[in-house]
Structures are given as structure tokens and as C-alpha cells.
UniProtKB/Swiss-Prot annotation:
PROSITE patterns: IG_LIKE (PS50835), SEMA (PS51004). Plays an important role in signaling via the cell surface receptor PLXND1. Mediates reorganization of the actin cytoskeleton, leading to the retraction of cell projections. Promotes focal adhesion disassembly and inhibits adhesion of endothelial cells to the extracellular matrix. Regulates angiogenesis, both during embryogenesis and after birth. Can down-regulate sprouting angiogenesis. Required for normal vascular patterning during embryogenesis. Plays an important role in ensuring the specificity of synapse formation. It holds the Pfam family ig. Transmembrane segments: none annotated. Disulfide bonds join 105-115, 133-142, 270-382, 294-342, 519-537, 654-729. It is found in: Secreted. Residues 32-516 form the Sema domain. Residues 755-775 have a biased composition (Basic and acidic residues). This is Semaphorin-3E. Residues 1-25 form the signal peptide. Keywords: Angiogenesis, Developmental protein, Differentiation, Disulfide bond, Glycoprotein, Immunoglobulin domain, Neurogenesis, Secreted, Signal. GO terms for biological process: axon guidance; branching involved in blood vessel morphogenesis; gonadotrophin-releasing hormone neuronal migration to the hypothalamus; negative chemotaxis; negative regulation of angiogenesis; negative regulation of cell-matrix adhesion; negative regulation of neuron apoptotic process; neural crest cell migration. It comes from Homo sapiens (Human).
Length: 775
């Protein structure tokens, strides 16, 4: 079995790699830009809110564009933060459990940390109030928060100190899976409704309609579910036909060969469902569910499934009846770990619910299509008298229709994604994907969905996917990797504001906001901007700036952008370096000692670019590609000579290739000093003569106590005579003949660009640079 599993693993990995990376001209599996938490702060692109009490324990967030506030529910507290800058002008409500409740909770065997009031529900009840519910030390409670009608209204307080019971509206356990949505005055919630988290159910409470729930202990409806998301999506203009969709995972009864199989489901029920008259009294009579599939097609019809839903995002469109559903999945397989994002259209979801029902004749039978007569009205349909409907309420439904709905909640057809495959697959295991938010953007060459994906280590990935209809393939382009939080904490909630172009990100310890884009980070040239393929950004003839579609804030007609292909050569005609134009690149000077190691630094801004080194020897005009071997190694930081030969002297060109665009990042002239001459020079010099003969004082420009980064590097490669190297470098720096030449072209130990020095903090000035800027 082990060998068979190993073979399957190899086949899966090989197929995935071929499918998702083959044929790409650029390495789009890496982000084009990687920005640290510190860099985001320095760019003023992010703002962080920390609780003044030292703890937050965030569990829910609510975005209010009208009030321009972000409401945050944590442990014993509700915060109101400014959407403009969340770290400024916050308000808070302290809402702890009573001492008696906390004591009772601890006496029942719960930890003291669990016996607090964790806020799990925040919904707009009306223009002036929020509905909020908390776990209440394992005794759920609900209340209303007064927020005021106008933006200038400073109100933010609990409407009454007296709280209502929250059972069926909020879970007992702060860590239990839970979803809810407020429709009118009715709260729909999927949760575990008991103290021990055993009774999983979907509830409707509050409002004018009767309180209602799924049946107790019926595994055909829910079997150990994990609730992920819920939305009200209308089918048509008839409000009586409105339905609520629940997204969850559960143990699958129909997976007969695998008793532990986990499937993702879409559950659906009617908003106006009031249960049956004699059967399913005060129980849902319209509840149906279907399997939601996200899989990579495989050979011989064997798919690789991503069965466990992590997060779901509903992207509104101009047609409010047909939003686009984005699902973030992971695998439950023991063979390999991976994540995928699939997209679903409402037409596919409705087709599954309008299709055949799944049926099992008995314990010894297999699941199959129900081929008998389906009663009228069709089970799962809503009660409505519009267009001649006969039933005004589900209590009027015939018993056989209610009985059929009770015994056949599962649809036979699974819901498959658009293009029959995921739009994104990640199997590198670098981090786990946890949250997703999507913004739809108009670009010069079409419409793109920008995915913001939160991970379990505080990072947000900004990604676009491009479908090639002719090849039936999907290209994923990771535009940016943003380290949102200083510490690698899981991202547990995200809210998006397309209006403000801001993403609001919640972790257990802090809340952050980050702008969608910072276009000038891509570079100051047309090619850099076009190669970025960021639909938010375009070259305006002067700089890389925010792109606006024609007619909306468009101040300049000169807009160059190519998101689909990233063809900078075509968009930026005349700027590509070819032939003798390479000689226009500014020259840098580097020295190396024969038989020692030397690094020629070159790190392009884009992590997706392929680096190629060329060398020009002596007076030759011909440039040859550098051949790497055991002695000459191409690294992420540049070209490393482990043992320098005199024949290595020459002019080296560091070129990047990205989507067929060739760009010279750096031109370095390497001079090799004979080892014997260096030894002779230092042997002749004693300490007194050295001070007399040096053209300038032998003072290191490095502050006392600081360790030059090149010493650490030399130590790594085995060179131990640091003093001689430092003395030699001091001579080079202090020679009048060299000073003038090196003023604009620093040696390899200096920064190539003064801007880079400004960007670094003082302790890092003499550390090994992580990257170099374009010349």
C-alpha cells in the first residue's frame, strides 16, 4: 500500500505541476512584489489597531459604509473604528459577563479563558441600531447597540443593560463554528445550540415569523457540520420566493466507501418557511442541500478533490439575483496538502436544486437518482400566490410534499465550478489559506477579479487569474505578498470596501487596514508598470499610477496597461534595451582577490523575472552568457565566484527577462587583484608607514562596534583574514584617483543607489542587502 500511495502522490504532483506551471513565460508562482510589515508602515499603506486593554480576541467584524465605521466584536468588548484610519478615533463598549455567570461556567468544567463574553454576532438591525450577541460565559446573550442616525452622531452604547437570552442565535462555545445573517427582522443562524456543542441546527429567531429550526438528531440534514457562510439571494422579483443559502462542510452519508469523508454543501431554504401543519411542525419544510465540488480534472476521469470549505465570498454584480460565489477550499487527503479557489455561478447552483433528488431505498442499497413521482408543490419551493400560486404558506402544503421533503433533503447532482476547474491551486505548503475577499476591476483590456487571500501567518496575497479560452488553461498571477501583521498570526476575518479601495483584516490580536494598491512601488519606468500586470495601475506617461477607466477621473489620455499579457515591449515601444543600448547602463565597479570568493550583487525588483548574466572580456565587443558550474554559482542575491580566477575579470551584465521583455538591471566591471600583490603590499607596510603613506586617514566609515556585512559573508565562505581585506578596501576608497570614479559608481561594498540607503534603518546599513534597486 505504501508503494501505491507513493506512486499516486507522484502522479498527482506531476499532473498538478504540468497543469498549473507549464507554458508560462514568467515565474508567476512567486509574488512580483513582497512587502514586509515595516515597509507597509513606512509607505503609509497600512494602519493597525491594537486593543488598549492588551487583548482583543476578535471573533467578528461588520463594515458600515454609511456610518463610515468598522465594528469589531472581541472578548467582553465591542469597538467602533474609523474606516478612514482605524487606529484613530475609536469608541468602545465594555460588555463582560457577570461574576456569577463566570463562576458557574468555571464550576461546570470550562477554562477561565472560555468563561467570558465573546461577541459573535454583529448585524445592522436598522439605521440607528446594531444587533449583537455574545457567548456570555457559555450562556448566550443578545442586546442592541445604539449607533446614531448621522455620521456626526457620537452615540455608541448598549441600548439597555438588560440583555435577552441568545440561545439559537449565538453559540455557547467561543470556538464553535457559526454563521448568521439578518433578513428584515429575522435572524437566520447555523450553529451548535447546546452547552456541549452536540446539537447542530439552522435556526430562525426574532421578527414576526415563528421561531423554527432543523429537526433534532437527523443526520440526513446535518452531520457534524462546520458552518462557513450564509447569504440571502433572491431568485426573482417575488419577495415570497427569496431563499437563504448556507455554505458548510459535513460528514457525507452518501460516501459509502469512506465513512469519514468530508463534503462541502450548499443548503437552501425559503425565508418565509413556517413549517408544516401536521408534519415538521416548527421545523424547516423547504430545506434542501447539494454537494459543492472543487476539483482538478485528472487522467482517466480521476479528479483531485478539495473537499473542505475554508471560506466563501459573495461578489455582487449589477444583477442582484446572480452574484458570483468564490469558495476557498483545502484538501482532506492524507496524500498531499493543498488549497484551491473555485468560482460558481448561481445558474449552476439553481440547476442542481431544480434537478433530481438523491434516493436510497434501504441500508443495503446504493444512492441513486429518485425516479418516482415528485409531489406538488415541488419540495424545496417557496409558498407564494404570485402568478397564480395555490399556497400562501408552507402550512398549506399537502402532507405528501412535506413528507417527501423530510426524507429527500439531498440533491443528486453536484454543483461544479466555472470552467470545471479551480481558478487557483496552491500546493507548495508554504502557508495555509484561510480567508478570501474579491474586488472586480475594470482594466484597459477587460474586467478582472482581484483576489485578496488571507493566510495563517499574517500574510495577504493579492492575486489575479487569467483564463485562456483557446488553451482551456488558467494562469494565476501573484501581484503582491503583503505581511500585514508584525507577528505571523492567522487571519480570521476580512472585510472589503471597493468604494474606499481598502481591505480590513482581523486577527485574534489586532485589526489592520491596507490599501489595494501602491502603484509607484512597481518602478519609475513604463516597462516596470506594464510588467506588473496590476489592473489597478497603468503608465500615464510620467509615472505608474492608479488606472481609471475612460470617462471616470481620467485626466490623461496616455494610459499604457496590459494585464492579460504583460507585453511591455509593445506597450513601451522604444524603451527596451537591445544591442548597443546596453552600454548606456550606469557602470558599477567591484574588486575581487584572486583565489578568494566574490559576489556580484544583483536582485531585480520583480521576483517573477528570470535573471541572465552576460560577460564582456577585455576589449571584446561580443557578450557571452555566463556559464555556471561548481565554481561560479547563480544565486538569488547575484553571481557568486567561489574561487576567483584572473580570467574572470571583465564587465558583467545582469539582465532580467519577463514576458519576453529584456531589461539590464546592473552593469558591473570586475577587477581581479592578484593574491601575491596583495600579500606583498601588506607585508611591506608596517603600522607607522601605513598611516604616513595612506592618502587619507585609515578610518573605517563603519561605526565602531558595527560589523560590516561583508565580514559575515567572508566568514561564511571561509576567508578569515578580515583585517587585510578591510585595509585593502580602505586604500581603494581613499585613493584620489578612485574617489572621483566611484562617486557615482560605488564599489561592491557600498549601496548602488542613495535611495536604498534612505530606505534602510541604521542598524542595517552594513548588512547584506535583501535587494537592489534598478540602476
Amino acid at each position: 500500500m505504501a508503494s501505491a500511495g507513493h506512486i499516486i502522490t507522484l502522479l498527482l504532483w506531476g499532473y498538478l505541476l504540468e497543469l498549473w506551471t507549464g507554458g508560462h513565460t514568467a515565474d508567476t508562482t512567486h509574488p512580483r512584489l513582497r512587502l514586509s510589515h515595516k515597509e507597509l508602515l513606512n509607505l503609509n499603506r497600512t494602519s493597525i489597531f491594537h486593543s488598549p486593554f492588551g487583548f482583543l480576541d476578535l471573533h467578528t467584524m461588520l463594515l458600515d459604509e454609511y456610518q463610515e465605521r468598522l465594528f469589531v466584536g472581541g472578548r467582553d468588548l465591542v469597538y467602533s473604528l474609523s474606516l478612514e484610519r482605524i487606529s484613530d478615533g475609536y469608541k468602545e463598549i465594555h460588555w463582560p459577563s457577570t461574576a456569577l455567570k463566570m463562576e458557574e461556567c468555571i464550576m461546570k468544567g470550562k477554562d477561565a479563558g472560555e468563561c467570558a463574553n465573546y461577541v459573535r454576532v454583529l448585524h445592522h438591525y436598522n439605521r440607528t441600531h446594531l444587533l449583537t450577541c455574545g457567548t456570555g460565559a457559555f450562556d448566550p446573550v443578545c442586546a442592541f447597540i445604539r449607533v446614531g442616525y448621522h455620521l456626526e452622531d457620537p452615540l455608541f452604547h448598549l441600548e439597555s443593560p438588560r440583555s435577552e437570552r441568545g440561545r439559537g442565535r449565538c453559540p455557547f462555545d467561543p470556538s464553535s463554528s457559526f454563521i448568521s445573517t439578518l433578513i428584515g427582522s429575522e435572524l437566520f443562524a447555523g450553529l451548535y445550540s447546546d452547552y456541549w456543542s452536540r446539537d447542530a441546527a439552522i435556526f430562525r429567531s426574532m421578527g414576526r415569523l415563528a421561531h423554527i429550526r432543523t429537526e433534532h438528531d437527523d443526520e440526513r440534514l446535518l452531520k457534524e457540520p462546520k458552518f462557513v457562510g450564509s447569504y440571502m439571494i433572491p431568485d426573482n422579483e417575488d419577495r415570497d420566493d427569496n431563499k437563504v443559502y448556507f455554505f458548510f462542510t459535513e460528514k457525507a452519508l452518501e460516501a459509502e466507501n469512506n465513512a469519514h469523508a468530508i463534503y462541502t454543501r450548499v443548503g437552501r431554504l425559503c425565508v418565509n418557511d413556517v413549517g408544516g401543519q401536521r408534519i415538521l411542525v416548527n421545523k424547516w419544510s423547504t430545506f434542501l442541500k447539494a454537494r459543492l465540488v472543487c476539483s482538478v480534472p485528472g487522467m482517466n476521469g480521476i479528479d483531485t478533490y478539495f473537499d473542505e470549505l475554508e471560506d466563501v465570498f459573495l461578489l455582487p454584480t449589477r444583477d442582484h439575483k446572480n452574484p458570483v460565489i468564490f469558495g476557498l477550499f483545502n484538501t482532506t487527503s492524507n496524500i498531499f496538502r493543498g488549497h484551491a479557489i473555485c468560482v460558481y455561478h448561481m445558474s449552476s447552483i439553481r440547476a442542481a436544486f431544480n434537478g433530481p433528488y438523491a434516493h436510497k431505498e434501504g441500508p443495503e442499497y446504493h444512492w441513486s437518482v429518485y425516479e418516482g413521482k415528485v409531489p406538488y408543490p415541488r419540495p424545496g419551493s417557496c409558498a407564494s400566490k404570485v402568478n397564480g400560486g395555490r399556497y400562501g404558506t408552507t402550512k398549506d402544503y399537502p402532507d405528501d410534499a412535506i413528507r417527501f421533503a423530510r426524507s429527500h433533503p439531498l440533491m443528486y447532482q453536484a454543483i461544479k465550478p466555472a470552467h470545471k476547474k479551480p481558478i487557483l491551486v496552491k500546493t507548495d505548503g508554504k502557508y495555509n489559506l484561510k480567508q478570501i475577499a474579491v474586488d472586480r476591476v475594470e482594466a484597459e483590456d477587460g474586467q478582472y477579479d482581484v483576489l485578496f487571500i488571507g493566510t495563517d501567518n499574517g500574510i495577504v496575497l493579492k492575486v489575479i487569474t487569467i483564463y485562456n479560452q483557446e488553451m482551456e488553461s488558467m494562469e494565476e498571477v501573484i501581484l503582491e505578498e503583503l505581511q500585514i501583521f508584525k507577528d505571523p498570526v492567522p487571519i480570521i476575518s476580512m472585510e472589503i470596501s471597493s468604494k474606499r479601495q481598502q481591505l480590513y483584516i482581523g486577527s485574534a490580536s489586532a485589526v489592520a487596514q491596507v490599501r489595494f494598491h501602491h502603484c509607484d512601488m512597481y518602478g519609475s519606468a513604463c516597462a516596470d508598470c506594464c510588467l506588473a500586470r496590476d489592473p489597478y495601475c497603468a503608465w500615464d506617461g510620467i509615472s505608474c499610477s492608479r488606472y481609471y477607466p475612460t470617462g471616470t477621473h481620467a485626466k490623461r489620455r496616455f494610459r499604457r496597461q496590459d494585464v492579460r499579457h504583460g507585453n511591455a515591449a509593445q506597450q513601451c515601444f522604444g524603451q527596451q534595451f537591445v544591442g548597443d543600448a546596453l552600454d548606456k547602463t550606469e557602470e558599477h565597479l567591484a574588486y575581487g582577490i584572486e583565489n578568494n570568493s566574490t559576489l556580484l550583487e544583483c536582485t531585480p525588483r520583480s521576483l517573477q523575472a528570470k535573471v541572465i548574466w552576460f560577460v564582456q572580456k577585455g576589449r571584446e565587443t561580443r557578450k557571452e552568457e555566463v556559464k555556471t558550474d561548481d565554481r561560479v554559482v547563480k544565486m538569488d542575491l547575484g553571481l557568486l565566484f567561489l574561487r576567483l580566477h584572473k580570467s574572470d575579470a571583465g564587465t558583467y551584465f545582469c539582465q532580467t527577462v519577463e514576458h519576453s521583455f529584456v531589461h539590464t538591471v546592473r552593469k558591473i566591471t570586475l577587477e581581479v587583484v592578484e593574491e601575491e600583490k596583495v600579500e606583498d603590499m601588506f607585508n611591506k607596510d608596517d603600522e607607522e608607514d601605513r598611516h604616513h603613506r595612506m592618502p587619507c586617514p585609515a578610518q573605517s566609515s563603519i561605526s565602531q562596534g558595527a560589523k560590516p556585512w561583508y565580514k559575515e559573508f567572508l566568514q561564511l565562505i571561509g576567508y578569515s583574514n578580515f583585517q587585510r581585506v578591510e585595509e585593502y578596501c580602505e586604500k581603494v576608497w581613499c585613493t584620489d584617483r578612485k574617489r572621483k570614479k566611484l562617486k557615482m559608481s560605488p564599489s561592491k561594498w557600498k549601496y548602488a543607489n542613495p535611495q536604498e540607503k534612505k530606505l534602510r534603518s541604521k542598524p542595517e546599513h552594513y548588512r547584506l542587502p535583501r535587494h537592489t534597486l534598478d540602476s
